Protein backbone atom coordinates (compact mmCIF):
# COMPACT_ATOMS: atom_id res chain seq x y z
CA UNK A 1 0.00 0.00 0.00
CA UNK A 2 1.08 3.56 -0.70
CA UNK A 3 1.18 5.51 2.55
CA UNK A 4 1.62 9.29 3.03
CA UNK A 5 5.18 10.38 2.36
CA UNK A 6 5.88 7.72 -0.26
CA UNK A 7 6.83 8.45 -3.87
CA UNK A 8 5.17 6.64 -6.78
CA UNK A 9 7.46 6.63 -9.81
CA UNK A 10 5.83 5.78 -13.14
CA UNK A 11 6.73 6.24 -16.81
CA UNK A 12 4.28 7.67 -19.33
CA UNK A 13 4.38 4.46 -21.34
CA UNK A 14 2.93 2.57 -18.35
CA UNK A 15 -0.05 4.86 -17.72
CA UNK A 16 -2.28 2.97 -20.14
CA UNK A 17 -1.77 -0.33 -18.32
CA UNK A 18 -2.19 1.31 -14.91
CA UNK A 19 -5.14 3.55 -15.74
CA UNK A 20 -7.67 1.76 -13.53
CA UNK A 21 -5.21 1.51 -10.63
CA UNK A 22 -4.37 5.22 -10.80
CA UNK A 23 -8.04 6.21 -10.98
CA UNK A 24 -8.66 4.24 -7.78
CA UNK A 25 -5.51 5.68 -6.22
CA UNK A 26 -6.57 9.27 -6.97
CA UNK A 27 -10.17 8.71 -5.84
CA UNK A 28 -9.19 7.22 -2.48
CA UNK A 29 -7.02 10.25 -1.76
CA UNK A 30 -9.58 12.78 -3.03
CA UNK A 31 -6.96 13.95 -5.57
CA UNK A 32 -4.85 15.34 -2.70
CA UNK A 33 -1.52 14.36 -4.17
CA UNK A 34 1.47 16.26 -5.55
CA UNK A 35 2.24 15.56 -9.22
CA UNK A 36 5.84 16.13 -10.30
CA UNK A 37 5.96 15.70 -14.07
CA UNK A 38 9.43 15.57 -15.62
CA UNK A 39 9.76 16.12 -19.39
CA UNK A 40 6.26 17.57 -19.61
CA UNK A 41 6.88 18.41 -23.28
CA UNK A 42 5.92 14.77 -23.96
CA UNK A 43 2.25 15.90 -23.88
CA UNK A 44 2.51 18.81 -26.32
CA UNK A 45 0.08 17.20 -28.80
CA UNK A 46 -3.41 17.80 -27.34
CA UNK A 47 -4.95 15.08 -29.52
CA UNK A 48 -2.49 12.30 -28.68
CA UNK A 49 -3.67 9.36 -26.55
CA UNK A 50 -0.77 9.91 -24.13
CA UNK A 51 -1.82 13.53 -23.57
CA UNK A 52 -5.50 12.72 -23.07
CA UNK A 53 -4.66 9.91 -20.64
CA UNK A 54 -2.26 12.04 -18.57
CA UNK A 55 -4.74 14.90 -18.39
CA UNK A 56 -7.63 12.61 -17.47
CA UNK A 57 -5.74 11.03 -14.58
CA UNK A 58 -3.97 14.01 -13.04
CA UNK A 59 -5.76 17.24 -13.98
CA UNK A 60 -7.49 17.36 -10.58
CA UNK A 61 -4.31 16.83 -8.54
CA UNK A 62 -4.09 19.38 -5.72
CA UNK A 63 -0.43 20.26 -6.35
CA UNK A 64 1.40 20.11 -9.68
CA UNK A 65 4.94 20.85 -10.81
CA UNK A 66 5.87 20.46 -14.48
CA UNK A 67 9.52 20.47 -15.53
CA UNK A 68 11.00 20.44 -19.02
CA UNK A 69 13.92 21.81 -20.97
CA UNK A 70 11.80 22.30 -24.09
CA UNK A 71 8.40 23.80 -23.27
CA UNK A 72 7.60 24.14 -26.97
CA UNK A 73 9.30 22.92 -30.14
CA UNK A 74 7.28 23.92 -33.18
CA UNK A 75 4.35 26.09 -32.13
CA UNK A 76 2.93 28.03 -29.20
CA UNK A 77 -0.09 25.71 -29.30
CA UNK A 78 2.14 22.99 -27.81
CA UNK A 79 1.98 24.96 -24.56
CA UNK A 80 -1.76 24.44 -24.21
CA UNK A 81 -1.84 20.82 -22.98
CA UNK A 82 0.63 21.63 -20.21
CA UNK A 83 -1.44 24.65 -19.14
CA UNK A 84 -4.60 22.54 -19.21
CA UNK A 85 -2.98 19.89 -17.00
CA UNK A 86 -1.91 22.55 -14.50
CA UNK A 87 -5.08 24.67 -14.39
CA UNK A 88 -7.79 22.13 -15.31
CA UNK A 89 -9.69 24.67 -17.45
CA UNK A 90 -10.39 26.72 -14.33
CA UNK A 91 -10.61 30.48 -13.81
CA UNK A 92 -6.80 30.45 -13.68
CA UNK A 93 -6.68 30.08 -17.47
CA UNK A 94 -9.24 32.59 -18.69
CA UNK A 95 -9.20 33.66 -22.33
CA UNK A 96 -8.99 37.45 -22.34
CA UNK A 97 -8.62 37.79 -26.12
CA UNK A 98 -11.60 39.65 -27.56
CA UNK A 99 -10.64 38.77 -31.15
CA UNK A 100 -9.62 35.41 -32.59
CA UNK A 101 -7.82 34.82 -35.88
CA UNK A 102 -7.83 32.15 -38.55
CA UNK A 103 -6.47 31.48 -42.04
CA UNK A 104 -8.92 31.89 -44.90
CA UNK A 105 -8.83 29.93 -48.17
CA UNK A 106 -6.14 32.24 -49.54
CA UNK A 107 -4.03 31.66 -46.41
CA UNK A 108 -4.52 35.26 -45.31
CA UNK A 109 -5.22 35.97 -41.63
CA UNK A 110 -8.84 36.96 -40.92
CA UNK A 111 -10.41 37.80 -37.56
CA UNK A 112 -13.74 37.59 -35.75
CA UNK A 113 -15.24 38.18 -32.31
CA UNK A 114 -14.30 35.65 -29.62
CA UNK A 115 -17.43 34.15 -28.05
CA UNK A 116 -15.34 32.72 -25.20
CA UNK A 117 -13.84 36.07 -24.17
CA UNK A 118 -13.58 36.38 -20.36
CA UNK A 119 -14.35 32.67 -19.96
CA UNK A 120 -11.93 29.81 -19.21
CA UNK A 121 -10.55 27.90 -22.17
CA UNK A 122 -13.09 25.07 -22.62
CA UNK A 123 -12.19 21.42 -22.07
CA UNK A 124 -13.61 20.64 -25.51
CA UNK A 125 -12.00 22.68 -28.27
CA UNK A 126 -9.66 24.57 -25.96
CA UNK A 127 -6.55 23.87 -28.04
CA UNK A 128 -8.28 25.15 -31.17
CA UNK A 129 -9.31 28.35 -29.36
CA UNK A 130 -5.77 28.75 -27.99
CA UNK A 131 -4.36 28.60 -31.53
CA UNK A 132 -6.96 31.04 -32.85
CA UNK A 133 -6.22 33.47 -30.02
CA UNK A 134 -2.44 33.56 -30.20
CA UNK A 135 -0.87 31.86 -33.21
CA UNK A 136 -3.20 31.08 -36.14
CA UNK A 137 -0.46 31.11 -38.79
CA UNK A 138 1.66 28.04 -39.39
CA UNK A 139 5.20 28.51 -40.68
CA UNK A 140 6.00 26.13 -43.53
CA UNK A 141 9.12 25.27 -45.47
CA UNK A 142 7.99 27.62 -48.25
CA UNK A 143 6.24 30.31 -46.20
CA UNK A 144 8.85 31.64 -43.77
CA UNK A 145 9.01 35.14 -45.18
CA UNK A 146 5.22 35.41 -45.41
CA UNK A 147 4.01 34.28 -41.97
CA UNK A 148 6.94 33.85 -39.59
CA UNK A 149 4.40 32.57 -37.03
CA UNK A 150 3.30 36.01 -35.81
CA UNK A 151 2.03 36.18 -32.23
CA UNK A 152 -1.40 37.75 -31.65
CA UNK A 153 -2.82 39.10 -28.38
CA UNK A 154 0.72 39.18 -27.00
CA UNK A 155 -0.10 40.90 -23.73
CA UNK A 156 -2.68 38.28 -22.74
CA UNK A 157 -0.35 35.41 -23.60
CA UNK A 158 2.55 37.06 -21.77
CA UNK A 159 0.41 37.42 -18.65
CA UNK A 160 -0.46 33.71 -18.74
CA UNK A 161 3.18 32.71 -19.30
CA UNK A 162 4.54 35.05 -16.62
CA UNK A 163 2.34 33.61 -13.87
CA UNK A 164 2.98 30.01 -14.92
CA UNK A 165 6.53 29.48 -16.17
CA UNK A 166 9.88 30.04 -14.47
CA UNK A 167 12.70 29.81 -17.01
CA UNK A 168 16.41 29.37 -16.45
CA UNK A 169 18.63 29.12 -19.50
CA UNK A 170 21.66 26.86 -19.48
CA UNK A 171 24.01 29.81 -20.00
CA UNK A 172 22.50 31.68 -17.02
CA UNK A 173 23.72 29.16 -14.45
CA UNK A 174 26.51 27.36 -16.32
CA UNK A 175 28.13 30.25 -18.20
CA UNK A 176 29.40 30.09 -21.77
CA UNK A 177 30.07 26.41 -22.27
CA UNK A 178 29.47 26.24 -26.01
CA UNK A 179 29.37 28.19 -29.26
CA UNK A 180 27.49 27.58 -32.49
CA UNK A 181 29.40 27.85 -35.76
CA UNK A 182 27.59 27.74 -39.10
CA UNK A 183 29.23 26.57 -42.32
CA UNK A 184 27.59 26.65 -45.73
CA UNK A 185 28.84 24.40 -48.51
CA UNK A 186 28.55 25.21 -52.20
CA UNK A 187 26.85 22.26 -53.96
CA UNK A 188 28.91 20.52 -56.61
CA UNK A 189 27.81 20.03 -60.20
CA UNK A 190 26.52 16.56 -59.35
CA UNK A 191 24.44 17.82 -56.42
CA UNK A 192 22.87 20.59 -58.48
CA UNK A 193 22.03 18.00 -61.12
CA UNK A 194 20.15 16.00 -58.46
CA UNK A 195 18.12 19.09 -57.46
CA UNK A 196 17.19 19.73 -61.09
CA UNK A 197 16.23 16.10 -61.61
CA UNK A 198 13.94 16.20 -58.57
CA UNK A 199 12.22 19.42 -59.67
CA UNK A 200 12.10 18.99 -63.45
CA UNK A 201 11.77 15.20 -63.85
CA UNK A 202 10.00 14.26 -60.66
CA UNK A 203 7.33 12.21 -62.46
CA UNK A 204 10.10 10.10 -64.03
CA UNK A 205 11.89 9.25 -60.76
CA UNK A 206 8.83 9.03 -58.48
CA UNK A 207 8.67 5.22 -58.70
CA UNK A 208 12.32 4.93 -57.61
CA UNK A 209 11.56 6.31 -54.13
CA UNK A 210 7.83 5.86 -53.48
CA UNK A 211 5.37 3.03 -53.98
CA UNK A 212 2.52 3.81 -56.40
CA UNK A 213 -0.85 4.71 -54.87
CA UNK A 214 -4.25 3.55 -56.09
CA UNK A 215 -5.73 6.97 -55.37
CA UNK A 216 -4.14 9.08 -58.11
CA UNK A 217 -5.81 12.26 -56.85
CA UNK A 218 -4.19 11.82 -53.42
CA UNK A 219 -0.88 10.97 -55.08
CA UNK A 220 -1.06 14.22 -57.05
CA UNK A 221 -1.67 16.21 -53.85
CA UNK A 222 1.39 14.61 -52.27
CA UNK A 223 3.66 15.72 -55.11
CA UNK A 224 5.24 18.76 -53.44
CA UNK A 225 5.51 17.03 -50.04
CA UNK A 226 7.40 14.19 -51.70
CA UNK A 227 9.59 16.62 -53.62
CA UNK A 228 10.51 18.26 -50.32
CA UNK A 229 11.42 14.86 -48.86
CA UNK A 230 13.73 14.14 -51.78
CA UNK A 231 15.27 17.63 -51.74
CA UNK A 232 16.09 17.16 -48.05
CA UNK A 233 17.56 13.73 -48.72
CA UNK A 234 19.62 15.24 -51.55
CA UNK A 235 21.29 17.49 -48.96
CA UNK A 236 22.68 14.47 -47.13
CA UNK A 237 23.29 11.57 -49.54
CA UNK A 238 22.94 13.07 -53.06
CA UNK A 239 25.48 10.62 -54.49
CA UNK A 240 22.96 7.81 -53.93
CA UNK A 241 20.21 9.53 -55.91
CA UNK A 242 19.14 9.65 -59.54
CA UNK A 243 20.86 12.32 -61.62
CA UNK A 244 24.09 12.45 -59.62
CA UNK A 245 27.45 12.39 -61.36
CA UNK A 246 30.97 13.24 -60.32
CA UNK A 247 32.94 12.50 -57.14
CA UNK A 248 32.03 9.38 -55.13
CA UNK A 249 31.30 11.49 -52.03
CA UNK A 250 29.26 14.73 -51.74
CA UNK A 251 30.78 18.15 -51.03
CA UNK A 252 29.45 18.19 -47.45
CA UNK A 253 31.28 14.97 -46.61
CA UNK A 254 34.47 16.34 -48.15
CA UNK A 255 34.21 19.52 -46.04
CA UNK A 256 33.80 17.42 -42.89
CA UNK A 257 36.82 15.39 -43.99
CA UNK A 258 38.93 18.55 -44.34
CA UNK A 259 37.83 19.75 -40.89
CA UNK A 260 38.78 16.41 -39.35
CA UNK A 261 42.17 16.36 -41.06
CA UNK A 262 43.32 19.93 -40.43
CA UNK A 263 41.32 21.35 -37.49
CA UNK A 264 39.42 18.81 -35.38
CA UNK A 265 42.21 16.62 -34.02
CA UNK A 266 40.46 15.53 -30.81
CA UNK A 267 37.27 13.58 -30.24
CA UNK A 268 34.49 14.47 -32.70
CA UNK A 269 30.80 13.49 -32.85
CA UNK A 270 28.84 13.59 -36.11
CA UNK A 271 25.05 13.62 -35.80
CA UNK A 272 23.07 12.43 -38.84
CA UNK A 273 19.32 12.24 -39.41
CA UNK A 274 19.12 9.05 -41.51
CA UNK A 275 20.61 5.57 -41.54
CA UNK A 276 21.77 6.12 -45.13
CA UNK A 277 23.89 9.05 -43.97
CA UNK A 278 25.32 7.04 -41.05
CA UNK A 279 26.33 4.25 -43.44
CA UNK A 280 27.88 6.74 -45.87
CA UNK A 281 29.97 8.48 -43.19
CA UNK A 282 31.03 5.13 -41.74
CA UNK A 283 32.40 4.11 -45.15
CA UNK A 284 33.88 7.56 -45.86
CA UNK A 285 35.70 7.86 -42.52
CA UNK A 286 37.06 4.31 -42.63
CA UNK A 287 38.52 5.11 -46.03
CA UNK A 288 39.92 8.57 -45.23
CA UNK A 289 40.91 8.13 -41.55
CA UNK A 290 41.84 4.48 -40.97
CA UNK A 291 44.16 5.46 -38.11
CA UNK A 292 41.41 7.10 -36.00
CA UNK A 293 39.06 4.97 -33.85
CA UNK A 294 35.54 4.98 -35.31
CA UNK A 295 32.35 4.28 -33.35
CA UNK A 296 28.90 3.95 -34.94
CA UNK A 297 25.57 4.06 -33.08
CA UNK A 298 22.19 3.57 -34.71
CA UNK A 299 18.75 3.71 -33.14
CA UNK A 300 18.45 -0.08 -32.91
CA UNK A 301 21.48 -0.36 -30.60
CA UNK A 302 20.50 -1.46 -27.09
CA UNK A 303 21.16 0.80 -24.11
CA UNK A 304 23.95 -1.32 -22.61
CA UNK A 305 25.73 -1.72 -25.95
CA UNK A 306 25.35 2.00 -26.62
CA UNK A 307 26.79 2.91 -23.23
CA UNK A 308 29.68 0.47 -23.76
CA UNK A 309 30.52 2.10 -27.11
CA UNK A 310 30.37 5.57 -25.57
CA UNK A 311 32.67 4.51 -22.72
CA UNK A 312 35.21 3.25 -25.27
CA UNK A 313 34.81 6.49 -27.26
CA UNK A 314 35.45 8.52 -24.10
CA UNK A 315 38.76 6.72 -23.51
CA UNK A 316 40.17 7.67 -26.94
CA UNK A 317 42.10 10.84 -27.76
CA UNK A 318 40.96 11.31 -31.36
CA UNK A 319 37.97 9.00 -31.76
CA UNK A 320 35.12 9.76 -34.17
CA UNK A 321 31.53 8.99 -33.21
CA UNK A 322 28.94 8.70 -36.01
CA UNK A 323 25.31 8.31 -34.95
CA UNK A 324 21.77 9.38 -35.65
CA UNK A 325 20.79 12.42 -33.61
CA UNK A 326 17.70 10.58 -32.43
CA UNK A 327 19.77 7.76 -30.88
CA UNK A 328 21.50 10.09 -28.37
CA UNK A 329 18.71 12.42 -27.34
CA UNK A 330 18.51 11.34 -23.68
CA UNK A 331 19.92 9.22 -20.85
CA UNK A 332 23.59 9.46 -21.88
CA UNK A 333 26.44 11.88 -21.22
CA UNK A 334 29.65 12.29 -23.22
CA UNK A 335 31.41 15.10 -21.33
CA UNK A 336 34.88 14.97 -22.92
CA UNK A 337 33.97 15.47 -26.61
CA UNK A 338 34.51 19.11 -27.57
CA UNK A 339 33.45 19.16 -31.24
CA UNK A 340 29.97 18.22 -32.42
CA UNK A 341 28.95 18.31 -36.09
CA UNK A 342 25.27 18.58 -37.10
CA UNK A 343 25.41 16.99 -40.54
CA UNK A 344 21.70 17.47 -41.33
CA UNK A 345 18.94 19.52 -39.74
CA UNK A 346 15.96 18.23 -37.79
CA UNK A 347 12.68 20.15 -37.83
CA UNK A 348 13.35 22.28 -34.73
CA UNK A 349 16.22 23.51 -32.57
CA UNK A 350 15.16 21.72 -29.33
CA UNK A 351 15.38 18.33 -31.05
CA UNK A 352 18.92 19.08 -32.18
CA UNK A 353 19.79 20.50 -28.75
CA UNK A 354 18.70 17.24 -27.16
CA UNK A 355 21.48 15.62 -29.21
CA UNK A 356 24.36 18.02 -28.79
CA UNK A 357 23.65 18.72 -25.12
CA UNK A 358 24.69 15.11 -24.48
CA UNK A 359 28.19 16.56 -24.93
CA UNK A 360 27.63 19.86 -23.09
CA UNK A 361 27.30 19.28 -19.34
CA UNK A 362 27.49 21.44 -16.23
CA UNK A 363 30.84 19.93 -15.33
CA UNK A 364 32.28 20.18 -18.85
CA UNK A 365 35.73 21.71 -18.95
CA UNK A 366 36.61 23.98 -21.84
CA UNK A 367 34.48 25.29 -24.70
CA UNK A 368 32.28 23.04 -26.83
CA UNK A 369 31.93 23.79 -30.54
CA UNK A 370 28.71 22.91 -32.38
CA UNK A 371 29.00 23.03 -36.18
CA UNK A 372 25.89 23.37 -38.35
CA UNK A 373 26.81 22.34 -41.90
CA UNK A 374 24.31 23.11 -44.66
CA UNK A 375 24.28 23.49 -48.44
CA UNK A 376 23.79 26.99 -49.82
CA UNK A 377 21.16 27.41 -52.55
CA UNK A 378 19.29 24.37 -51.26
CA UNK A 379 16.17 23.36 -49.33
CA UNK A 380 18.37 23.31 -46.21
CA UNK A 381 18.25 27.11 -46.17
CA UNK A 382 14.46 26.85 -45.99
CA UNK A 383 14.81 24.38 -43.15
CA UNK A 384 17.23 26.66 -41.32
CA UNK A 385 14.88 29.63 -41.69
CA UNK A 386 12.00 27.46 -40.49
CA UNK A 387 13.75 26.24 -37.33
CA UNK A 388 14.85 29.80 -36.53
CA UNK A 389 11.27 31.05 -36.93
CA UNK A 390 10.17 28.35 -34.48
CA UNK A 391 12.99 29.27 -32.12
CA UNK A 392 11.70 32.84 -32.05
CA UNK A 393 8.44 31.50 -30.62
CA UNK A 394 10.29 29.26 -28.19
CA UNK A 395 12.14 32.33 -26.90
CA UNK A 396 8.81 34.13 -26.40
CA UNK A 397 7.53 31.24 -24.28
CA UNK A 398 10.74 31.32 -22.21
CA UNK A 399 10.84 35.05 -21.45
CA UNK A 400 7.50 36.54 -22.58
CA UNK A 401 9.23 38.88 -25.03
CA UNK A 402 9.37 38.81 -28.81
CA UNK A 403 12.99 38.31 -29.82
CA UNK A 404 14.18 40.20 -32.88
CA UNK A 405 14.88 37.98 -35.89
CA UNK A 406 18.36 39.48 -36.13
CA UNK A 407 19.16 38.34 -32.56
CA UNK A 408 18.13 34.76 -33.33
CA UNK A 409 20.13 34.78 -36.56
CA UNK A 410 23.17 36.12 -34.70
CA UNK A 411 22.91 33.50 -31.93
CA UNK A 412 23.03 30.71 -34.50
CA UNK A 413 25.67 32.38 -36.68
CA UNK A 414 23.31 32.73 -39.66
CA UNK A 415 23.34 35.50 -42.26
CA UNK A 416 19.99 37.33 -42.69
CA UNK A 417 20.60 37.04 -46.45
CA UNK A 418 19.34 33.47 -46.12
CA UNK A 419 15.86 34.64 -47.19
CA UNK A 420 17.18 35.48 -50.65
CA UNK A 421 18.25 31.86 -51.28
CA UNK A 422 15.00 30.14 -50.28
CA UNK A 423 13.03 27.72 -52.40
CA UNK A 424 9.45 28.97 -52.79
CA UNK A 425 6.12 27.44 -53.66
CA UNK A 426 4.09 29.47 -56.15
CA UNK A 427 0.87 28.95 -58.14
CA UNK A 428 0.50 29.36 -61.91
CA UNK A 429 -2.51 30.74 -63.83
CA UNK A 430 -4.11 27.28 -63.93
CA UNK A 431 -3.92 26.87 -60.16
CA UNK A 432 -1.08 24.35 -60.24
CA UNK A 433 1.71 24.68 -57.69
CA UNK A 434 5.36 24.78 -58.66
CA UNK A 435 8.65 25.29 -56.86
CA UNK A 436 10.79 28.38 -57.38
CA UNK A 437 14.53 28.09 -56.77
CA UNK A 438 15.76 31.58 -55.88
CA UNK A 439 14.63 33.90 -58.65
CA UNK A 440 14.23 31.10 -61.17
CA UNK A 441 10.96 29.28 -61.83
CA UNK A 442 11.13 25.50 -62.11
CA UNK A 443 7.84 23.72 -62.89
Regions found by a protein language model. Give the residues of each.
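Conserved RecA-like P-loop NTPase helicase motor core
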Residues: 44, 294-382, 390
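A short helix-turn-beta junction within AAA+ P-loop NTPase domains corresponding to the substrate/partner-engaging
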Residues: 79-93
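Conserved Helicase C-terminal RecA-like lobe
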Residues: 6, 174-191, 199, 213-332, ...
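Conserved RecA-like ASCE ATPase "motif II neighborhood" in helicase/translocase motors
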Residues: 9-34, 42-57, 323-328
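Inter-lobe coupling linker of SF2 helicases/translocases
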Residues: 9-14, 28, 48-62, 90-240, ...
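Conserved helicase ATPase motor motifs in RecA-like P-loop NTPase domains
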Residues: 61-76
Amino acid sequence: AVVPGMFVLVSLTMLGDLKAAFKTFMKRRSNKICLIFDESDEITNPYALRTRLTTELFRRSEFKLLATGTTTRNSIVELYSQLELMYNNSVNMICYASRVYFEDKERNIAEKYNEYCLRPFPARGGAKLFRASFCPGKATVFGIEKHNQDIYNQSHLSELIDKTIITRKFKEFAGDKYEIINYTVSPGVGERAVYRTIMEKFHEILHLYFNPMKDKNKESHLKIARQIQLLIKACSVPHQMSGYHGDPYPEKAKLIGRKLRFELRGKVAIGCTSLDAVAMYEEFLKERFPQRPLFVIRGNVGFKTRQHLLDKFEKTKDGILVCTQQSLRSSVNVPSCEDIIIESLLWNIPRMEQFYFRFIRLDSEGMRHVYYITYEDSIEQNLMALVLAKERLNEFVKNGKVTEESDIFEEFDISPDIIETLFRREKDDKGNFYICWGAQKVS
